[in-house]
Amino acid sequence: MKHIAIKENHLYSKAYAKGQKFVSRNTVVYVLKDLKSEKLMRANPMKEYVNRIGLTVSKKLGGAVVRNRVKRILREGLRQTENEMNLKKGYLIVIVARASIVDASSIHIKKELTKAFTSLRMIEQ
């Protein structure tokens, strides 16, 4: 499923300040209930709740090529995790890349995201 990107800076700040956090070797995952999800559900043609996803990759990690590769790896790990697990809908999810992610593969990221979402109770039964 195509994600709705978080574009407003205040939503990132809110997720950092009030969201639940899971720290792992390559990523930090923040999760916060999205208050605008009701409005987005009505606008969505399929009339279901959606998660809004934000990826944060610092310039400290490297040049544009490296940062874009890291974002592709994060998106792929998230896609694989969502295909395997039934994530709860209606949340803001912010994934922050750490320095060690440059050498990681999407398989490692998928394992970390699975562990993070399980720990944050984001899996629907």
Please annotate each region the language model reported.
Residues 1-125:
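Positively charged, solvent-exposed patches that mediate nucleic-acid binding
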